[in-house]
Every structure is written in C-alpha cells, then in structure tokens.
Regions:
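Solvent-exposed, flexible loop/coil residues
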Residues: 15, 51, 59, 140, ...
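A structural signal for alpha-helical segments
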Residues: 12, 53-56, 110
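Short, low-complexity N-terminal intrinsically disordered segments enriched in polar/charged residues
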Residues: 1-26, 30, 34-38
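Short, well-structured alpha-helical interface segments that form or flank functional binding sites
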Residues: 19, 56, 117
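A solvent-exposed, acidic/Ser-Thr-rich amphipathic alpha-helical stretch
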Residues: 33-99
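A beta-strand edge to alpha-helix "cap/lid" segment located at domain peripheries
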Residues: 3-5, 70-167
Length: 167
C-alpha cells in the first residue's frame, strides 16, 4: 500500500471509530440494548464504569443498563467530545473522549449533569470496528432535585459517584 493509501486508510479508520462511538451513545440514549451490543466485540471484552461496575460479559452489562434506564421517566443525553484516536495496527486502535452527560428523571424530579472521559481500545472484527475495552472516568457530578415548592435543591456536587436513579 502506498504512503498516500495508508494515510487515507488511517483517516477512514478514525472516521469509522468516531461513527461507532456516536452509534453507541445514541443507542444508550434510546435504550436500544441490541444496538449497544452491536458496538462491542464478541469476546475478550472489558467495560469498566467505575462506581457502576466492571463487566466482561456484554449481556450482564446490558441487564444492569436496562434496569437503570428502561423507564419513560428516564431521559438522558450522552455528548462525546474531543476524540483523540490512534490507529495502533491494522486491526487495533485506541482512543480517549471527553463525555458530558445530562439526565432528567421526571419521576423523582432529579436533574443530573456528569462529565468525565472515556479511554477505549478498539478492534476490527469482520471488517468492522468494535469497542473492545471502555473505561469511564468520572471527573464531575452535579445533581439537583426539585423540592415541594419547585425550587432546585443541590443533592451532590463534585466528583461524587451517584446516579439520579438512586435519588
């Protein structure tokens, strides 16, 4: 492969990984477990979400994910930012992303704003990039709840682990 062809392939791989991560976050927001599952490798997987847990089995992760999110009162948005992606070999890559997360839990009247970053490893499987390892590092958490008179009350502030679904 020529130098130009290699550079083009590298850019196409980076773009494919960006689209993969966007599909993953969109599937999370839509609570589409099948679409989330399609974003991950079929074996040798690690999902490490710190205070939420570590998983090497995608189905175990999806079971908890659906328990936490699959209710009409749970409305969330994942925003991935500032990707740094490195193609480490023909079928291996790594990346780091900033992530901002907003959640409104209408049943408990809680709003949550979280930020942090992901560190990922990717592997090409059957010609398609997949997430092999993902680690989320929480750097800030702000949780507010509406009180009886409609004012917002601060529940958590800082890098305190916690979820609006637990409030």
């Amino acid at each position: 492969m020529t130098d130009l062809a290699q550079r083009i392939q590298r850019l196409e791989d980076i773009e494919a990984i960006k689209k993969l991560k966007a599909r993953y976050w969109f599937a999370c927001d839509r609570r589409d477990a099948d679409a989330v599952k399609q974003c991950f490798v079929s074996d040798d997987l690690l999902i490490d979400f710190g205070f939420i847990g570590q998983f090497t089995d995608i189905d175990e992760f999806l079971e908890l994910f659906m328990q936490m999110t699959n209710k009409p009162s749970h409305i969330d948005l994942h925003h991935g930012l500032a990707p740094e992606i490195s193609i480490d070999g023909d079928d291996d890559a790594s990346g780091r992303w900033r992530m901002q997360f907003q959640l409104i839990e209408t049943e408990t009247e809680v709003a949550q704003f979280m930020g942090g970053y992901y560190e990922d490893d990717y592997r090409r499987e059957n010609g398609e990039w997949k997430i092999a390892t993902t680690r989320y590092h929480l750097t800030f958490n702000l949780m507010l709840q509406k009180d009886a008179v409609g004012a917002l009350k601060l529940i958590e502030m800082g890098a305190v682990p916690g979820l609006a679904s637990e409030a």
